[in-house]
């Protein structure tokens, strides 16, 4: 009847007037981020105070029963685990997460590294993509110093919907992959290398200046950014 309709309209008005973030004083949780961009807010754990991290983690978990944090330390993991025993921590990628079981994943992303030293950044990309619903094929240590290693996995790489190329040193892997596949290549320069690599700047400049088509470049060591894209 009209009264019930009016009540429902008032409830709807109250809901839409609610701020699209949760005020915490030291933080403003972006509760509508998934509505706007398709994926919920992620915690950048580095340099956060313990009390702040724990409260942010708790409130994000209360929203949807899932939380994903990047650049977490071992002590931060121990802090979160005291309250959330189910939390999972990967010391290689420094990812901290609680993830729903039996999550459906689609497509295939090939995450490739030039060397073993690049795997920590690659895992940040791979686990981010998996958390947000993609299947990931890991293809590690296939850099240009032994191009035959890359060519031995070319069929798998070419069958992917997207390729992530993670490389330090001179960063040539992204250009090589860009010339071999007809899919988007997301290039991730890493800070791996000797003096003149300038903590990843050399690889970044190589990737930005690539003559191969279809390459997009994220910031140095930004595996999360690549996995999100």
Show the residue positions of the predicted features.
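Short, acidic/small-residue loops that bind anionic groups at enzyme active sites
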Residues: 88-90, 177-201, 215
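Glycine-rich oxoanion-binding loops at beta->alpha junctions
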Residues: 97, 135-156, 201-202, 218
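Glycine-rich phosphate/diphosphate-binding loop of Rossmann-like nucleotide-binding domains
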Residues: 106-148
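Short glycine/serine/threonine-rich phosphate/pyrophosphate-binding segments
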Residues: 53, 118-123, 147-148, 167-176, ...
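C-terminal binding/interaction regions
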Residues: 113, 158, 192, 196-229
């Amino acid at each position: 009847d009209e009264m019930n309709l009016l009540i429902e309209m008032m409830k709807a008005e109250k809901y839409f007037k609610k701020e699209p973030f949760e005020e915490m004083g030291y933080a403003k949780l972006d509760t509508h981020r998934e509505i706007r961009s398709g994926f919920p807010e992620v915690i950048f754990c580095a340099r956060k105070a313990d009390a702040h991290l724990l409260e942010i983690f708790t409130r994000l978990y209360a929203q949807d029963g899932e939380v994903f944090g990047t650049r977490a330390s071992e002590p931060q993991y121990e802090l979160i685990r005291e309250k959330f025993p189910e939390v999972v921590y990967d010391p290689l990628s420094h990812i901290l997460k609680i993830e729903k079981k039996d999550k459906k994943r689609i497509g295939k992303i090939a995450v490739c590294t030039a060397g073993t030293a690049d795997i920590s950044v690659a895992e940040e990309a791979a686990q981010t993509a998996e958390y947000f619903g993609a299947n990931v094929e890991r293809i590690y240590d296939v850099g240009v110093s032994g191009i035959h290693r890359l060519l031995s996995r070319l069929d798998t790489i070419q069958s992917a919907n997207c390729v992530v190329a993670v490389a330090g040193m001179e960063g040539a892997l992204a250009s090589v992959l860009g010339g071999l596949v007809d899919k988007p290549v997301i290039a991730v320069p890493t800070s791996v290398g000797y003096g003149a690599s300038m903590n990843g700047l050399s690889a970044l400049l190589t990737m930005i200046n690539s003559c191969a088509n279809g390459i997009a470049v994220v910031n140095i060591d930004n595996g999360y950014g690549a996995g999100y894209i």
